[in-house]
Each structure stands twice: as structure tokens, then as C-alpha cells.
């Protein structure tokens, strides 16, 4: 009697660093758009910071030198991540999540700055929430891609699965499980407190599930849960002084508006259609707090006017459209979800930053990608851009492999048809 043996499937082997594949034209155009945004951002940062740098640091080039240095480091990191195999990143999401949680806990024991604990000081400062956003993109994409597709018919019995059971399993596997790791991150960010980090991280993870192929029922369940959570927060906002002060400055009239928001609106109004000219901002002369960071878009509006603001927005829109094209043409579902998450981070940060600057949303302290000063943010953004390069080249390689396979099949079918002997039934053999 022959006994069948079950062999375990060996884990797929791969090199950590590999050549992803050829460069598609869309990826080249996307990189060109990224380069324009980065150069534009450096010009505006220097214009917004040279007065502040001289008055605060004694060096007009202080902020721009720091940004250029971090840009150099970020480009090196981008090159590294563009060569890292996405399967290695997927395997490291578990250890990366543990490290991220440990760092978020360590931040709570650091010295507060402006009433918040957001920076970890280890010889230099690291904003751990930026690392958390990157980690949650990778982890949420991994869990969402891993969720099995549930059929309404039981494959074993062939019977129809009860609607309630099917819906419950879908909500658990496609919504609750991918978002479960977000809960500890949100709690730790709330203890800092860092409301903008909570909003962005939650919005990014939600966008991954929304655009990643979750059904309408799952989207409805997630949206309903988010609305109920927001309602609960607003009902108990009096017990959170940090949020109450931000909301009061947003809902009341100009007399109670925060100085940052008020000066930001002055800057936008002063710019008019064409602006005061590059370098001619008045509000950046220490009138507008955080002119080099969260409110740099106000300086753009003041110096370049409505035209300059529209150009910045259109550049980001073009960048996002090209990036989403790369994501949706990736080689597998995991890469697609990671690409969606990275583009969602850029989109939400741009939207929230402009909304805060124009007083459409309360002041939450969200930077403008590639424009605002901040080493941790810039380096991690460029690391994510490296992942996008890997995704774009991997998708092009997969496309060429499919085309070659299709051509090979067509060639074999053609050879097979040419080698077939056709017999005429009217002719005797």
C-alpha cells in the first residue's frame, strides 16, 4: 500500500536588493513631475525662510541648508528603496510594526515642545508619526491583500452561505482585521497629543481599503463607523482641552481666531491674482508663525498670487494621477494597495494643509509635502517615492512578461496550425 506524503511548500526565495525591471514612460513622467515639485518647494522654502533664519539662527541659509542636506539623504534612501524587493518589505511589516509601537511609546517620555510630545531625540530629532504612517501603509496593504475573497456559495457543499454570516465574515476579514493594528497607533498618537497624525493615518488606511477593491457594503460599514466615531469625539470634545482650543479658534469670529490662521488669511488676501513677487512677502517677516513649515502655502499665495497657488495644486494633481496609474498597473494586489496608500498620504496632506491655511479646517499642524521644512518628513517621503519607483518598474516588467507569454502562445498555435495536415474527403488516398 502506497502512503501519500504531504510536502510543505518552500517559501519563495528572493534577493533583498534586485533590479525591478524597465522604466515605463509614465514612471519617467511621474519622476519629472516630482523633480519639478521638489525644486519648486526648495525655491519657496528659501524665500519663506531666509528672514526667519537670519533673525532666529543668525544664518539666512539655515533652513535651506538643512533641507538640502536632508534632500541628499532622502535621495540616497529613495535609491535604496527603489531596489528593495517588495516581498522583503512585506515580510518585514510585523517587526516594523513592533519597532514603530516601541518608538511611539518612547516619544511619550521625551521632553514636551509646545505642549506636545511628538519628537524623539537621539542626537537628532525624529518625528515618529511620520514613520508610523509609512509602516501603516505597508501593514494595512499586507493585511488587505491577504484577506481571502469570500464567495456566496460554499465550495464544499455547494449551498448558499447565509447572507448574515457572509456579511459578518467579510466585515471581519476585509475591514476589522486590516484596521485592527491601527488602534494602538491611534491611542499612542492621542497621548502625545497628535490629532493631525491620527486623522492622516486613519484617512490613509481607509483610502487603501476604499480604493483597493472592497465592496460597497464594506465601504458603507467603514464609513458609518467613522461617522459614529467622529460624532462621539465631538460630543466629548469638552473633556479634551487640546481639541477644544483648536475648534474654538476655528468656529469663532476673527477676534478669537488663532494668530497663525489670521496672518495666513492676510497673506493670501495680499497676494491677489499674480502676487507681490518672489521674495517680497511681508507676512513672513515674523508676522506669520510657522511660515517655513505648516503655513508655507500662505507665502506661496502672497508672493505668487492665485496663479502660483493654482500651479502648485495642478502639479500635485498631475503627480497623484500619474502615481495612481502606476499603482493600478502594479504586478500584484499588494503593490497596488501600497501605491494607493502612498498616493493617499500625499493627497490627504496637500488637501488638509491647504484647508488649514485657508481656514476651511481647524489648525491641525499638517505640513505641505516637499515644500515644508522637516528632515524626517522629507526623508520618509522620498523613501516612499523609492517604493513607488519599484512598483512602477515591477508593473512594467510584469506587463512585458505577459506580452511575451502571449506572443509565445500565439507563435505555438500558429506553428501547430501550419503543421496540421488537411485531408480532402473528395480525394481518394
Where are the language model's segments positioned?
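Hydrophobic alpha-helical transmembrane segments
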Residues: 69-77, 302-323
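Hydrophobic residues within the alpha-helical transmembrane core of Major Facilitator Superfamily
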Residues: 105, 133, 206-207, 347
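Hydrophobic, glycine- and aromatic-enriched re-entrant/interface helices and adjoining loop segments
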Residues: 113-119, 218-312, 331-338
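Loop-to-helix entry and N-terminal half of a specific, functionally important transmembrane alpha helix
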Residues: 327-365, 371
Amino acid at each position: 500500500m502506497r502512503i501519500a506524503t504531504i510536502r510543505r511548500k518552500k517559501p519563495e526565495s528572493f534577493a533583498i536588493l534586485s533590479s525591478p525591471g524597465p522604466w515605463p514612460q509614465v514612471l519617467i513622467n511621474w519622476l519629472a513631475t516630482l523633480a519639478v515639485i521638489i525644486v519648486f518647494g526648495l525655491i519657496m522654502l528659501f524665500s519663506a525662510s531666509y528672514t526667519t533664519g537670519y533673525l532666529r539662527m543668525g544664518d539666512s541659509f539655515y533652513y535651506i541648508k538643512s533641507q538640502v542636506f536632508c534632500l541628499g539623504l532622502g535621495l540616497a534612501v529613495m535609491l535604496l528603496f527603489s531596489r528593495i524587493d517588495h516581498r522583503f518589505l512585506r515580510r518585514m511589516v510585523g517587526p516594523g510594526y513592533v519597532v514603530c509601537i516601541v518608538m511611539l511609546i518612547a516619544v511619550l517620555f521625551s521632553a514636551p515642545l509646545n505642549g506636545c510630545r511628538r519628537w524623539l531625540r537621539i542626537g537628532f530629532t525624529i518625528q515618529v508619526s511620520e514613520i508610523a504612517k509609512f509602516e501603516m501603509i505597508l501593514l494595512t496593504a499586507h493585511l488587505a491583500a491577504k484577506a481571502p475573497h469570500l464567495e456566496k456559495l460554499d465550495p464544499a457543499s455547494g449551498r448558499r452561505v447565509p447572507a448574515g454570516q457572509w456579511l459578518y465574515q467579510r466585515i471581519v476579514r476585509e475591514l476589522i482585521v486590516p484596521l485592527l493594528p491601527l488602534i494602538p497607533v491611534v491611542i499612542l498618537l492621542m497621548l502625545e497629543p497628535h490629532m493631525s497624525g491620527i486623522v492622516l493615518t486613519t484617512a490613509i488606511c481607509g483610502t487603501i481599503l476604499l480604493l483597493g477593491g472592497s465592496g460597497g457594503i464594506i465601504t458603507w460599514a467603514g464609513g458609518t463607523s467613522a461617522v459614529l466615531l467622529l460624532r462621539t469625539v465631538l460630543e466629548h470634545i469638552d473633556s479634551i482641552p487640546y481639541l477644544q482650543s483648536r475648534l474654538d479658534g476655528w468656529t469663532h469670529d476673527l477676534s478669537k481666531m488663532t494668530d497663525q490662521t489670521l496672518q495666513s488669511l492676510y497673506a493670501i488676501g495680499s497676494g491677489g491674482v499674480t502676487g507681490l513677487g518672489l521674495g517680497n512677502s511681508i507676512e513672513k517677516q515674523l508676522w506669520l508663525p510657522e511660515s517655513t513649515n505648516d503655513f508655507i502655502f500662505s507665502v506661496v499665495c502672497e508672493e505668487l498670487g492665485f496663479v502660483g497657488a493654482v500651479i502648485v495644486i495642478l502639479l500635485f494633481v498631475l503627480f497623484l494621477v500619474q502615481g495612481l496609474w502606476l499603482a493600478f498597473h502594479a504586478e500584484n494586489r499588494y503593490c497596488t494597495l501600497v501605491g494607493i496608500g502612498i498616493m493617499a498620504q500625499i493627497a490627504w496632506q496637500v488637501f488638509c494643509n491647504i484647508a488649514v491655511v485657508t481656514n476651511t479646517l481647524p489648525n491641525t499642524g499638517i505640513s505641505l509635502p516637499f515644500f515644508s521644512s522637516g528632515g524626517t518628513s522629507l526623508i520618509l517621503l522620498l523613501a516612499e517615492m523609492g517604493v513607488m519607483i519599484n512598483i512602477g518598474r515591477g508593473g512594467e516588467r510584469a506587463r512585458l512578461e505577459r506580452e511575451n507569454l502571449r506572443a509565445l502562445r500565439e507563435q505555438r498555435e500558429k506553428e501547430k496550425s501550419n503543421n496540421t495536415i488537411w485531408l480532402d474527403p473528395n480525394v481518394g488516398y
